[in-house]
């Protein structure tokens, strides 16, 4: 955890390559101090088919899913940090946005948590 899922119009890659966008989001999340570097996961999905408002031709939105426990101020600071890092790289973009959603630790499961040897339920086992 966390997961940063980026959705964007494919024409965004004419402004910056996917690798630059991915690395910028990863580095910003890492520098926030909210997550262990090895826990951060960033991926990008681009779209050729989409409809935007008149005169608008590009978008990028980041959906962040993080484990519960951060304050509203920390989540807002994370969104602001990532958008501030991306904005200069995507100066011509029509829409640039992000939201942070939390999930409950009690309902979270991963491969480590189902390992019978992991008696402490350590999600990093």
Question: Model regions: which residues?
Answer:
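Histidine-centered catalytic/metal-coordination loop motif
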Residues: 32-35, 41-65
